[in-house]
């Protein structure tokens, strides 16, 4: 089009002059048609100046130069005596850009693509570029199977040579795959091969991955999957000969045919490594060992290459090249693998930098590093630093970037890019419950206090049965070696009878201090001392309580009792989770225990063990299986029993969902005469008149507990990728029990269950939603108990909520 205009302009110029071949001297230059473009700008873009002698070639160059500015739709150059007359038609200016009918592509993405092509508000409109954009968008829709889609650019003229640009989309429907055929397969059935595809011609209801909607990109991925399937089973000569994609006449159905040549199976005859091994030939040789007669496997070859790169990366060779060349012997059906290695230069770390830590101090991040500045670059050390930052729980994401230092052949900077999350929470609540009455709760918890890494918490609860307050502080780096120091003080006034537990009141206060000693990257030992004062009152006779009082030398009808205990607290934590919150891979084991020491009124020990294992079942870690267990056991020492107020409890959102908190397990069996006061309005149970006691629904807990949970974590529907790291959905199956190993069935009426039996397992199943919301960690769960016992109390819907800054 431009050349046609150039030719017309040249002809006009030739016809306007009588001596074009000899040229003429330009005395003046005039423009016609300029509106937005200044005369000076137009003159600067021209190769001709006043006083120049010009000919036909100069005029052609002038026209080309003016078109090249992108400001003009049409250019003509005429001669009027010695004056050069330039007639132009400016391209219109885009006043606005709107979209209509686009559902698959967001407006923001369209604007970005248009701007990349130079189409934006305030710029001139190039109709040729617009045609290319229309075609490109239609090609995109074709690639995702929408072959009836169309995109039209509607240009509406406005005053002052401006236009409104509107892109009108008719997306149509996605073509569905009617049939997938594989031609040339003999070793494996078509059904077996297609079962590994994302694209399917039939998708059962339970298959959440398969898709009948055609997408060019998915087909390319499926073809690569097909290639890998054969190469991993020894078919070294496998080849995809051709692929045909055919449309039905109505463009709503697609037939896919893949033509392949399987070839024969080949076995590896050996691996030969050569090149610059940087002195690590022995270690590399271990990575290339093969079993005699092993089938050729493409995935194993790729893994071997990656393992060699990782090995060299640990020794500072940041950019090694590893290339494998298979030598195929068709005569004996073997493959000899020749591996060429070039370790390259060894790199050293000049600086370690952190980006994105607006709250956390650099020192908090730097102390987690295992890579040192000035040392050679160790890829494993850099990765360890990333893992440790993730496990802090301060960040949503942690990424690393190794940047070469300009002008240096062997230096790099390591950059950790973090995205901080809200680590502090303030929660305040006012509620009313049938058991608790009016309830007030407030708390402040900051796991990264002022960016120092300190964990500080202040919590309090006030309701009809409890007044509780606690202050806790932990310094994770009390020493430079990573020894942590934590402590807390607390006060608790607890009236168990109003909480649907056995009848007693306990006013307690205490303090403890704990040191944590890191053993290695994943293991920490803890040791500390604690003190607690318990003052019990309003105790009503029940069998478990009677046993404890008698072991302490008190009579069964004692209604008040006080005890001061000093404890040695200990623990062990193994943590190999991939991050501190919403993990998707790895395991965590936490063992805690305490035992009373001389000077204590009570003599007992108590141990609990928590485990959690996350197993991703896809490469993106969006589908994860979680297994959790919790075990607890305690008992008395020196002929004494463990205090009943130290018992284990189960039920609620942290143990067995679907049951009310702390209601699973043994129930109180009250002795004769309990609550016979006619003025006592406690109606948890009828007045007991049996000499041997009577049962109730008041939970007393037990000295042994076992809880297990199996959870299937799935992508949350309708949540964009931006918020995927803040929301988690899961389906779960919980089970658990609490029992009393010291229970004597002969001490209770015949209608009371045997509370020493660990087989009374409760079970429930349901769905949970967790959200790191602006209000703090928020957890919803709905569970249905499907195995329960008399006295158990169901609570299907449960949630926790707080507020975060």
From Swiss-Prot:
Q: Which PROSITE patterns match?
A: POTRA
Q: Signal peptide span per the entry?
A: 1-20
Pfam family example for this protein? Omp85
Q: Identify the keywords attached in UniProt to this record, alphabetized.
A: Cell outer membrane, Membrane, Repeat, Signal, Transmembrane, Transmembrane beta strand
UniProt xrefs under Gene3D superfamilies = membrane protein fhac, membrane protein fhac: a member of the omp85/tpsb transporter family
Q: List localization entries.
A: Cell outer membrane
Q: Name one GO biological process term.
A: protein insertion into membrane
Entry superkingdom: Bacteria
GO cellular component term of the entry, any: Bam protein complex
Q: Which residues form the POTRA domain?
A: 24-91, 92-172, 175-263, 266-344, 347-421
Where does this chain mainly localize? Answer: membrane
Q: Does the keyword Ligase apply?
A: no
Give the protein's biological function: Part of the outer membrane protein assembly complex, which is involved in assembly and insertion of beta-barrel proteins into the outer membrane. Constitutes, with BamD, the core component of the assembly machinery.
Q: Which family does it belong to?
A: Belongs to the BamA family.
Q: Fill in the subunit field for this protein.
A: Part of the Bam complex, which is composed of the outer membrane protein BamA, and four lipoproteins BamB, BamC, BamD and BamE.
What is the protein name stated in its UniProt record?
Outer membrane protein assembly factor BamA
Q: Which organism is it from?
A: Salmonella paratyphi C (strain RKS4594)
Q: Which gene encodes it?
A: bamA
């Amino acid at each position: 089009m431009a050349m046609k205009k150039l030719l017309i302009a040249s002809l006009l110029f030739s016809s306007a002059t009588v001596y074009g071949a000899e040229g003429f001297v330009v005395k003046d230059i005039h423009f016609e048609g300029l509106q937005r473009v200044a005369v000076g700008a137009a003159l600067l873009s021209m190769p001709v100046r006043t006083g120049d002698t010009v000919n036909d070639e100069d005029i052609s160059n002038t026209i080309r130069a003016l078109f090249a500015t992108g400001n003009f739709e049409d250019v003509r150059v005429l001669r009027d005596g010695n004056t050069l007359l330039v007639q132009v038609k400016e391209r219109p200016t885009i006043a606005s850009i709107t979209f209509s009918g686009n559902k698959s592509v967001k407006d923001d993405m369209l604007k970005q693509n248009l701007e990349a092509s130079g189409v934006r508000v305030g710029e001139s409109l190039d109709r040729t570029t617009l045609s290319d954009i229309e075609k490109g968008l239609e090609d995109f829709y074709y690639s995702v199977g929408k072959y009836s889609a169309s995109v039209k650019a509607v240009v509406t003229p406005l005053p002052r040579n401006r236009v409104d640009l509107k892109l009108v989309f008719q997306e149509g429907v996605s073509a569905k795959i009617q049939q997938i055929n594989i031609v040339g397969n003999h070793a494996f059935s078509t059904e077996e091969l297609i079962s590994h595809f994302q694209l399917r011609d039939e998708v059962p209801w339970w298959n959440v991955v398969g898709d009948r909607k055609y997408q060019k990109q998915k087909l390319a991925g499926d073809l690569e999957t097909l290639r890998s399937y054969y190469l991993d089973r020894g078919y070294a000569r496998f080849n995809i000969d051709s692929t045909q994609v055919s449309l039905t006449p109505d463009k709503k159905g697609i037939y896919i045919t893949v033509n392949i040549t399987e070839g024969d199976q080949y076995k590896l005859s050996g691996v030969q490594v050569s090149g610059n091994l940087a002195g690590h030939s022995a270690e590399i040789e271990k990575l290339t060992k093969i079993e005699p007669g092993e089938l050729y496997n493409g995935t194993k070859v790729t893994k071997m290459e990656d393992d060699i790169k990782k090995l060299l990366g640990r020794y500072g060779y940041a950019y090694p090249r590893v290339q494998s060349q298979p030598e195929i012997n068709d005569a004996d059906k073997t493959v000899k693998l020749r591996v060429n290695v070039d370790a390259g230069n060894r790199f050293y770390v000049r600086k370690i930098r952190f980006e994105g830590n607006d709250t956390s101090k650099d020192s908090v991040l730097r102390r987690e590093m295992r890579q040192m500045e000035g040392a050679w670059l160790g890829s494993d050390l850099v990765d360890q630093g990333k893992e440790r930052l993730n496990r802090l729980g301060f960040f949503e994401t942690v990424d690393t970037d190794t940047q070469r230092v300009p002008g240096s052949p062997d230096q790099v900077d390591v950059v950790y890019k973090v995205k901080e999350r809200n680590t502090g929470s303030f929660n305040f609540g006012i509620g009313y419950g049938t058991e608790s009455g009016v309830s007030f709760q407030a708390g402040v918890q900051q796991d990264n206090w002022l960016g120092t890494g300190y964990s500080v918490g202040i919590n309090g609860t006030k309701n009809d049965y409890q007044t509780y307050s606690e202050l806790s502080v932990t310094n994770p780096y009390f020493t430079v070696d990573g020894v942590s120091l934590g402590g807390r003080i607390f006060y608790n006034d607890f009236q168990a009878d109003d909480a649907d537990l056995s009848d007693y009141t306990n006013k307690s206060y205490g303090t403890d201090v704990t040191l944590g000693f890191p053993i290695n990257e994943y293991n920490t030992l803890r040791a500390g001392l604690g003190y607690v004062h318990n003052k019990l009152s309003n105790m009503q006779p029940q069998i478990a309580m009677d046993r404890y009082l008698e072991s302490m030398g008190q009579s069964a009808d004692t209604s008040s009792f006080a005890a001061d205990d000093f404890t040695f607290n200990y623990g062990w934590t193994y943590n190999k989770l991939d991050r501190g919150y919403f993990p998707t891979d790895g395991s965590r084991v936490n063992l805690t225990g305490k035992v009373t020491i001389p000077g204590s009124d009570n003599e007992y020990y108590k141990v609990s063990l928590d485990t959690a294992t996350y197993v991703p079942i896809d490469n993106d870690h969006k589908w994860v299986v979680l297994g959790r267990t919790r075990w607890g056991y305690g008992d008395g020492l020196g002929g004494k029993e463990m205090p009943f107020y130290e018992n284990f409890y189960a039920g609620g959102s942290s143990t067995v969902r679907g049951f009310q908190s702390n209601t699973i397990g043994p129930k109180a069996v009250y002795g004769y005469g309990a609550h016979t006061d006619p003025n006592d309005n406690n109606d948890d149970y009828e007045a007991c008149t049996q000499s041997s006691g009577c049962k109730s629904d008041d939970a007393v807990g037990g000295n042994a507990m076992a809880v297990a949970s199996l959870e299937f974590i799935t992508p949350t529907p309708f949540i964009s990728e931006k918020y995927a790291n803040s929301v988690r959905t899961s389906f779960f199956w919980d089970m658990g029990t609490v029992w009393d190993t010291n229970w004597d069935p002969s001490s209770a009426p015949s209608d009371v269950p045997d509370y020493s039996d660990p087989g009374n397992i409760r079970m429930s199943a349901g769905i949970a939603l967790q959200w790191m919301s602006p209000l703090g960690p928020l957890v919803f769960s709905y569970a249905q108990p499907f195995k329960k016992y008399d006295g158990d109390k169901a609570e299907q819907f449960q949630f926790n909520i707080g507020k975060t800054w």
